[in-house]
């Protein structure tokens, strides 16, 4: 029950991060995503599921935000 709500909030926040130009604001929004991930971890359980959640919801989006920031700095 909690997973679909989490995924919808995650996608909305991540899209918001992509469209925000200031990097500090983007990271601030992403910090709220980290809070959502912590709430999800409480309900997930096994170590393998937690690893995949970490990979999908933390590592890959942070890498995308980093690439987005590098792209913005090269554009200016």
Curated annotation (Swiss-Prot):
The name this protein goes by in its record: Probable protein E5
Keyword annotations from UniProtKB, A to Z: Early protein
Similarity section: Belongs to the papillomaviridae E5 protein family.
Species lineage: Viruses, Monodnaviria, Shotokuvirae, Cossaviricota, Papovaviricetes
